[in-house]
């Protein structure tokens, strides 16, 4: 028995809501993945504030219909698709998918859409190679701290150097 019209409309509404919060959409070919493997992927994505949805291409097509920012996704809507919708840290979401794919070697990325632009496989890989938000914040904090430390050492060095010069002058004057 197929889905009712109300059920399909509910799914399309849910997809529209998810897409409104999504920054990046990855389209995966999930053919050959077991339920356990899909659950593993979903668990990995949950940590990164991302979600994996398996839905019919026609329902996704209806969800993106009329939304220009998602219009380019239409070209990827063929075959068996799982849609990874990344909400927050785009790099972390893509890394989670890539680590899953490297481990199971059953799923491949068909494409991705970021800010209305279809991304190539190289661009997707480049996003995965980016440091996470936390790593970037740590690097920036470290750089700021290093500058502050150098300034503090420099400020402290002026009176210390002056004291050494005076001491040397005083010792030199006694002899």
UniProtKB/Swiss-Prot annotation:
GO terms for cellular component: ribonucleoprotein complex; ribosome. Forms part of the ribosomal stalk, playing a central role in the interaction of the ribosome with GTP-bound translation factors. This is Large ribosomal subunit protein uL10. Disulfide bonds: none annotated. GO terms for biological process: translation. GO terms for molecular function: large ribosomal subunit rRNA binding. InterPro entries: Ribosomal_uL10, Ribosomal_uL10-like_sf, Ribosomal_uL10_bac, Ribosomal_uL10_bac_type. It comes from the Bacteria. Gene3D superfamilies: 3.30.70.1730, 6.10.250.290. The keyword Ribonucleoprotein applies. Keywords: Ribonucleoprotein, Ribosomal protein, RNA-binding, rRNA-binding. Belongs to the universal ribosomal protein uL10 family. Part of the ribosomal stalk of the 50S ribosomal subunit. The N-terminus interacts with L11 and the large rRNA to form the base of the stalk. The C-terminus forms an elongated spine to which L12 dimers bind in a sequential fashion forming a multimeric L10(L12)X complex.
């Amino acid at each position: 028995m197929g889905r009712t019209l109300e059920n399909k409309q509910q799914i399309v509404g849910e997809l529209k809501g998810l897409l409104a919060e999504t920054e990046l959409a990855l389209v995966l070919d999930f053919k050959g993945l077991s339920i356990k493997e899909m659950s593993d992927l979903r668990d990995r994505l949950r940590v990164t504030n991302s979600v994996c949805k398996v839905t019919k291409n026609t329902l996704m097509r209806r969800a993106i219909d009329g939304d220009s920012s998602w219009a380019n996704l239409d070209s990827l809507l063929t075959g068996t698709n799982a849609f990874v919708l990344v909400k927050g840290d785009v790099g972390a979401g893509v890394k989670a998918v890539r680590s899953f794919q490297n481990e199971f070697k059953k799923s491949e990325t068909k494409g991705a859409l970021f800010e209305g632009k279809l991304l190539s496989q190289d661009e997707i890989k480049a996003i995965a190679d980016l440091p996470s938000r936390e790593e970037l914040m740590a690097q920036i904090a470290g750089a700021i701290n290093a500058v502050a430390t150098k300034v503090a050492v420099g400020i402290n060095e002026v009176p210390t150097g002056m004291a050494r010069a005076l001491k040397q002058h005083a010792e030199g004057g006694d002899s």
